[in-house]
C-alpha cells in the first residue's frame, strides 16, 4: 500500500496533516492547462490523447503539491462503450447525438465491441502513475448511474432533470434496467483503471440532489451499491461525491464506500454525524476562491475548525471555477498546511 496521506485519510487513519486536492484541479484556471488544451485542439481531443491528458493531470500537482491527482477525463467518456455518441461544443456542456427518452431507446444502450476510450484513459492513468511522486495518490473516476442516466435522457446538462424524473416514474422497470447496465459498465471501467495504476476511485453523483430521498433510495441506491460493491475487490478507497444531497445523507450511509464528498450545503460535523465510519471530503464553496486571498484563508480556516480530527480530506464542495485566480488556490493549499 502506497504511503500516502490521502489514502490514509480515506481509511480513517491518523495523518500528520489533512490531505488536500481540488475537484477539477486540472483545468481552465491554469495557464499551463490552456496551452496544452490549445495544442490538443478541443476538450475531447485532449481527453483522448493519453500523453497530453497525463500532462494536464500532473500540472496542478507540480504547481501546488496536492496530495492527490485526479485523471483528466470526463464522466461521459466510458459511455462510448455502450454506443452512446456525444460532443463537447466550445461553450455550454456536452451534447449527446440524440436524447434517449424511451425504453426502446434505452434497450440500445448495450456493450459494444471495440470501444477505445476506456483504453485511452487507462493509458493516461499508467503514464501519470509512473510520473507521480510515490506519496501522491492517483484518483480515477466515473459518473454514478443516476447522473449518467440524466445525461442520456436529457441529451445535455439539465438544470432540473424534469424529463429524466418523468421517465423514471413512467417506466420504472425499464429505467432500473438502464441504471443496472450503467452500473456494470462503470464498474468494469474503473476496475480497468485500477489495474492501470489508480490508487483510489471517486464516483460522481452530481445530480443526486434532484431526487427526493424516497426516489433516490428506490432507484439510485441499488445500482450505486452494485457499482461500489463490485469495486470492493480492488482494495482501493471508494469515494462517493453527491451534489446537493444534504437531504440524502442518511440514505447514503447504506452505500458501500470509504469516503463521502459533500458540498457546502451541509456542515462537516453534520455530515460526519450522519455518515459514521466514513471519511468526509470537502466542502469549501468554490465561490470563496473568487474572493481575495485573505478571504480564502479566512474561509479555509473556518472550514478546518469544523472538520473531523480524523478521516477528513480538504477539498471544495464542487469543481473549481474556471475564472479562479491561481493565487487563491495557493492561498487555500497554504492555509491547510499552515493551520495543520
Describe each region flagged by the PLM.
Residues 1-88, 221, 297, 326-340:
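N-terminal basic, low-complexity leaders that serve as flexible interaction/assembly modules and, when applicable
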Residues 28, 101-102, 157-158:
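Short connector loops/turns at beta-strand edges and beta->alpha or beta->beta junctions
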Residues 68-90, 96-114, 198-216, 317-319:
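Glycine-rich, proline-tolerant flexible connector loops at the mouths of alpha/beta enzymes
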Amino acid at each position: 500500500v502506497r504511503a500516502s496521506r490521502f489514502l490514509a485519510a480515506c481509511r480513517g487513519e491518523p495523518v500528520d496533516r489533512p490531505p488536500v486536492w481540488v475537484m477539477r484541479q486540472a483545468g481552465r484556471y491554469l495557464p499551463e492547462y490552456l496551452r496544452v488544451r490549445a495544442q490538443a485542439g478541443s476538450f475531447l481531443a485532449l481527453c483522448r490523447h493519453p500523453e497530453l491528458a497525463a500532462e494536464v493531470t500532473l500540472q496542478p500537482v507540480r504547481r501546488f503539491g496536492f496530495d492527490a491527482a485526479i485523471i483528466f477525463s470526463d464522466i461521459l467518456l466510458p459511455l462510448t462503450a455502450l454506443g452512446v455518441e456525444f460532443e463537447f461544443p466550445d461553450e455550454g456542456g456536452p451534447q449527446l447525438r440524440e436524447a434517449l427518452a424511451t425504453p426502446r431507446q434505452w434497450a440500445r444502450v448495450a456493450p459494444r465491441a471495440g470501444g477505445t476510450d476506456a483504453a485511452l484513459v487507462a493509458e493516461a492513468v499508467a503514464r501519470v502513475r509512473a510520473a507521480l511522486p510515490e506519496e501522491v495518490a492517483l484518483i480515477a473516476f466515473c459518473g454514478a448511474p443516476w447522473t449518467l442516466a440524466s445525461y442520456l435522457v436529457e441529451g445535455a446538462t439539465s438544470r432540473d432533470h424534469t424529463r429524466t424524473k418523468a421517465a423514471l416514474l413512467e417506466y420504472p422497470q425499464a429505467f432500473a434496467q438502464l441504471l443496472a447496465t450503467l452500473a456494470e459498465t462503470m464498474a468494469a471501467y474503473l476496475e480497468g483503471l485500477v489495474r492501470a495504476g489508480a490508487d483510489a476511485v471517486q464516483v460522481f453523483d452530481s445530480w443526486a440532489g434532484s431526487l427526493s430521498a424516497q426516489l433516490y433510495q428506490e432507484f439510485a441506491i441499488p445500482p450505486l451499491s452494485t457499482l461500489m460493491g463490485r469495486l470492493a475487490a480492488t482494495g482501493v478507497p471508494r469515494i462517493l461525491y453527491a451534489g446537493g444531497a444534504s437531504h440524502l445523507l442518511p440514505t447514503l450511509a447504506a452505500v458501500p464506500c470509504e469516503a463521502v464528498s459533500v458540498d457546502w450545503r451541509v456542515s462537516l460535523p453534520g455530515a460526519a454525524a450522519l455518515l459514521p465510519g466514513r471519511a468526509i471530503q470537502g466542502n469549501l464553496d468554490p465561490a470563496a476562491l473568487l474572493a481575495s486571498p485573505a478571504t480564502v484563508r479566512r474561509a479555509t480556516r473556518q472550514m478546518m475548525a469544523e472538520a473531523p480530527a480524523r478521516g477528513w480530506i480538504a477539498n471544495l464542495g464542487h469543481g473549481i471555477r474556471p475564472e479562479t485566480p491561481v493565487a487563491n488556490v495557493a492561498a487555500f493549499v497554504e492555509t491547510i498546511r499552515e493551520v495543520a
